[in-house]
């Protein structure tokens, strides 16, 4: 994942983490990208042809003991610590409230209201609780699971709640309205629900189950999938004592933005995005695979959302208070988006390489990956086929 367009402070944080823990750089770089976007929440928005906040759904892929979990855990620890403090305050206020309610009615403080728990991270929950949680924290909540497989398995666990279709609509911030018997109705005008977690490569096929390849769920995921994720030798190096604390301060700078920032694209950024959009549309039109068409369609959106994220990085690190996304920021966002195009193709190969999936055009993927400059060896490895087969397909495709 390219980080050359990140501020120097964040590049230093990423490189220090890699030096100490010997994990693929993609894992920590993506974790920085995601935690930055989540810290921004709904407070910075691009108001252009379409409105976009940096809403990301991220899937970090790696083998067991590859180090895929810890980088995101470190970057998200800021929010977990905030939740811990908030929960302790909630318990204290709940105790006071219950004590007050035990008094005779005439002696109660009539102005005292039942406390609420403000939280960022959602792990184990029932689907109908999300709107209630979100109504308390309207700047953004995150469904965060170490293993997304467990989260996917939970779909339908609660009386066929339709959680999957609800999640699909929240990606584009469609209103959420929950009405339940004996419950107060909840309405969320513009949901801001982030998603992050990990998955092992051999379990990727589960992503496509229950119609998720066809209904657009799979194409909404940004996949972090480094080429090498083997467990590395032990390193005696340690992070500097203030490294994580300083990163928390960085996230706090974004999390505590009070007044919403509304952005526009500079002329240069708009030209860059327009040119890239047209190239992306051409690639989509030339592809016959439904899943990949869906991916390319979401990349249009993600390029802008990532641009807002990069803007937030520069706002805090470089004190860039302009309310325009400039050409440099857009170029960085496009480069990162292209990384996620490549990983989507890699995921496609892992999920759909089974010969039983006859309806899916593997040859089209081979030709397309070759057009991106991937070697025959890399293509064969990604699709789990022989290099001679790749060579044969490319020879026929070039005739």
Indicate residue ranges for each PLM-predicted region.
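Phosphate-handling catalytic cores of nucleic-acid transaction enzymes
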Residues: 1-399
